[in-house]
């Protein structure tokens, strides 16, 4: 059986878990000859759906967290460089200009 079934994330599959346990505990020959396979397949399907739902929820939560982090970064940059990062644009242009001048000096030598 699945070892992680006690986790809270699989409470939606509790009926399938109980049905499979009952089938396994009732008569041993049913388990041996695969007569509990319907319950097992239903449980596997339920666990897969629960897992997919958990993954979807985790992706949505991570996107929300990422958006929050990006807002914070933007706020920090606006505080540091001004609105629309005008100061940063000016500094980047000056840096590129100095780099181009140093490259031209190196090529002319």
Swiss-Prot record:
Upper classification of the organism: Eukaryota, Fungi, Dikarya, Ascomycota, Saccharomycotina
Disulfide bonding pattern of the chain: 13-46, 23-36
GO cellular component, one term: mitochondrion
Motif (Cx9C motif 2): 36-46
Alphabetized Pfam families for the sequence: Cmc1
Subcellular location: Mitochondrion inner membrane; Mitochondrion intermembrane space
Record note on quaternary structure: Interacts with CMC1.
Keyword entries, A-Z: Chaperone, Copper, Disulfide bond, Membrane, Metal-binding, Mitochondrion, Mitochondrion inner membrane, Repeat
Note in the entry: Present with 279 molecules/cell in log phase SD medium.
GO molecular function, one term: metal ion binding
Function: Required for mitochondrial cytochrome c oxidase (COX) assembly and respiration. May be involved in copper trafficking and distribution to mitochondrial COX and SOD1.
Protein name: COX assembly mitochondrial protein 2
Keyword Repeat: yes
Domain CHCH as annotated: residue spans: 10-54
Family named by the database record: Belongs to the CMC family.
Bilayer topology: Peripheral membrane protein
Biological process, per Gene Ontology: mitochondrial cytochrome c oxidase assembly; mitochondrial respiratory chain complex assembly
Chain span(s) of sequence motif Cx9C motif 1: 13-23
Predominant location category: mitochondrion
Domains: entry comment: The twin Cx9C motifs are involved in the recognition by the mitochondrial MIA40-ERV1 disulfide relay system and the subsequent transfer of disulfide bonds by dithiol/disulfide exchange reactions to the newly imported protein.
């Amino acid at each position: 059986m699945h070892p992680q079934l006690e986790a809270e994330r699989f409470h939606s599959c509790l009926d399938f878990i109980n049905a499979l346990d009952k089938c396994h505990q009732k008569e041993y020959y049913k388990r041996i000859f695969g007569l509990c396979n319907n319950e097992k397949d239903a449980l596997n399907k339920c666990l897969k759906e629960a897992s997919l739902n958990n993954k979807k929820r985790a992706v949505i939560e991570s996107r929300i967290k990422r958006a929050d982090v990006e807002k914070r970064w933007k706020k920090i940059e606006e505080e540091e460089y001004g609105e629309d990062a005008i100061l940063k644009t000016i500094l980047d242009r000056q840096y590129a200009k100095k780099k181009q001048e140093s490259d031209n000096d190196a090529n002319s030598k």
